[in-house]
């Protein structure tokens, strides 16, 4: 099932022995991608973009990955959304109106500069939504030249000119979950009935998951975003009112 993903990775491995992988720690696409990349590259730097640093429920995934893939490096950088939160004082975070705004492209270039690695891998899939489908399908044509100067098709997964690749481009969530199960990898984190969506501090399912499983992580989030506590309080009040009826 994943021969196409392996073919994409193999194409890039002919160009470089080192890659940057944007890695969410607990998400299914990141878990599967690291397993697929590890046999093909000498150096892999996993870049984790955080909203709140040092959350234990995320760190268990980092420890698992380091144990299974001992040569992998991890680098933590602020999520691009965090800069916007700070600029506007979102959910009570300490506000700085002069905070410079960063995009994913800005962070990518900074990480390239810090690591000396050019090629970047992300877990984007066409099935994620219309914008990603349009972007990835545009890579079906020639997207640049390889290191030998030959024109190369992107196979809807490789941007040769910008040196970015997306091995999971044509797969669905169910395919990725099957790969994880079949290869004995750590299951991705789930909040309620949904898959992990990272550190979504406005998601009641995420906050309740932490409340019952990692209460110290919840307090860390509240210490940075004090107004996030209101989301949880409102939900509890709603449940209390329903019980009274």
Ranges and model annotations:
Residues 1-245:
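Nucleotide-activated chemistry modules centered on ATP-dependent adenylation/adenylyltransferase
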């Amino acid at each position: 099932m994943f021969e196409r993903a392996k073919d994409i990775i193999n194409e890039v491995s002919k160009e470089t022995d080192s890659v940057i992988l944007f890695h969410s720690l607990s998400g299914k696409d990141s878990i599967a991608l690291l397993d697929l990349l590890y046999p093909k590259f000498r150096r892999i730097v996993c870049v984790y973009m955080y909203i709140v640093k040092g959350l234990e429920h995320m760190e268990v995934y980092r420890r698992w990955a380091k144990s299974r893939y001992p040569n992998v490096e991890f680098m933590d950088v602020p999520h691009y959304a965090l800069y916007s939160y700070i600029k506007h004082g979102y959910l009570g975070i300490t506000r700085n109106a002069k905070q410079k705004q960063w995009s994913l492209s800005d962070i990518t270039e900074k990480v390239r500069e810090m690591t000396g690695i050019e090629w970047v891998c992300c877990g984007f899939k066409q099935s994620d939504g219309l914008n990603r489908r349009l972007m990835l399908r545009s890579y079906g044509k020639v997207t640049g030249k390889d290191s030998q100067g030959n024109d190369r098709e992107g196979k809807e997964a490789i941007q040769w000119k910008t040196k970015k690749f997306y091995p999971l481009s044509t797969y669905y969530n169910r395919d990725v979950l099957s790969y994880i199960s079949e290869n004995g990898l750590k299951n991705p984190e789930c909040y309620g009935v949904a898959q992990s969506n990272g550190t979504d501090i406005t998601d009641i399912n995420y906050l309740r998951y932490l409340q019952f499983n990692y209460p110290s992580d919840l307090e860390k989030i509240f210490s940075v975003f004090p107004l996030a506590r209101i989301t949880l309080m409102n939900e509890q009040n709603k449940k209390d009112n329903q019980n009274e009826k």
